[in-house]
């Protein structure tokens, strides 16, 4: 195992940030992610979990926020409903440099928080 990263996002605080800066959605999330959450009655908890996943990836790699662009790592959903990380560009280069060959991700949101756990191996 290379590393583990966990991140927690306060959903209402994240909602306020998205409301205050509407362009943030497109800056932080890929079209794939935005399409996935579009039919949800309240997409913000799912978006918060996906944001947490990006930060958890950076932590799993031992890096700080801003180590790579937000569109260089994102969450897709398998036909089974399981989340799957897609890591490209600078994020992929950093992962390869550290010997990462496989990713695992778990997302959840309940009540006031969204959480993501990422394992890089």
Regions found by a protein language model. Name each.
Residues 1-121:
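Core catalytic alpha/beta fold that binds nucleotide/phospho-ligands
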């Amino acid at each position: 195992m290379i590393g583990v990263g966990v991140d927690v996002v306060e959903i209402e605080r994240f909602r306020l940030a998205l409301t205050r800066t509407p362009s943030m959605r497109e800056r932080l999330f890929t079209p794939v992610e935005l399409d996935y959450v579009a039919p949800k009655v309240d997409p913000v908890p799912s978006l918060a979990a996906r944001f947490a996943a990006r930060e958890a990836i950076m932590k799993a790699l031992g890096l700080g926020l801003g180590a790579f662009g937000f569109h260089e790592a994102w969450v897709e959903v398998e036909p089974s409903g399981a989340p799957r990380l897609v890591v490209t560009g600078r994020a992929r280069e950093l992962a390869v440099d550290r010997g990462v060959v496989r990713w695992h991700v778990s997302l959840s949101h309940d009540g006031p928080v969204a959480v993501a756990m990422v394992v890089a191996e």
